[in-house]
Amino acid sequence: NFGKVIEPLAETFRVACVSYDGFDETEQTQFPTMIEETAKIEEYIKEHYDGKICAAYGCSLGGSFVGLMAARGVIHMDYGILGGSDLDQSAKLPAKLMTALMLPMIYPFLTTGRFRLPFLNRKLEKWRKAGDGYVDAFIGMMRGAGVDLSFITKESLRNQFYSDLITPLADAINPAGTEIHILYALKMGEKYRARYHRHFAHPVLHELDMQHEELLAVHPKEWVELIEDICRQK
């Protein structure tokens, strides 16, 4: 996800990248639950950084982890930065139905780069041709450049998708000494503004006239500059 920005970030910060259980080709693991995975991240930060870091950034699912760490208060971060995460939540039954519907579509695409249903591949190709490079850049960020993801199991993807939906994120999260910043892609829709303000007491919204994670996927240099600007505020 962050291949284009790690080196420039490392010029200013000590960078640690999180790989989730079940999504790292160097391990034979399955993704457990959001809470278990959050606890593992927190334990690593406690062991290697005395429980204190300058900033944590997460996009999509990663933003849920940043929110959970901010709410739990096990570790301290000066800045919690979310990259336009949707923070969707659901009761267990609807979450099971949604997972059952989405898994047959997402899993083949994630592991092979192709949907099982031909009309979805045609639709994707149409988006690619009509777009300005965002679709290809986003897919490249999600799947990696030429990376073989066939090691990811359906169980890991199922656990990740379902657990993210049913794991509650508190409202009015306001950890002492932590600023919450959100890279808010306006093209995602106005409902997310209200969602961010519900879950976080004082979020700083960086409004971008872009689509979900477009800044990171298409404009990595500008993304790095924004992250550096955020982390210079204290």
Regions inferred by a protein language model and the residue ranges of each:
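Conserved loop-alpha-helix segment in the C-terminal half of the alpha/beta-hydrolase fold
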Residues: E7-P8, E179-E213, H219
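Hydrolases whose catalytic domains are alpha/beta-hydrolase-1, hotdog thioesterase
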Residues: F65-M69, Y192
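Conserved serine/cysteine hydrolase catalytic core
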Residues: I152-R198
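Flexible "cap/lid" loop of the alpha/beta hydrolase fold
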Residues: A71, Y79-T111
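Post-His helix in hydrolase/transferase enzymes
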Residues: L216-C231
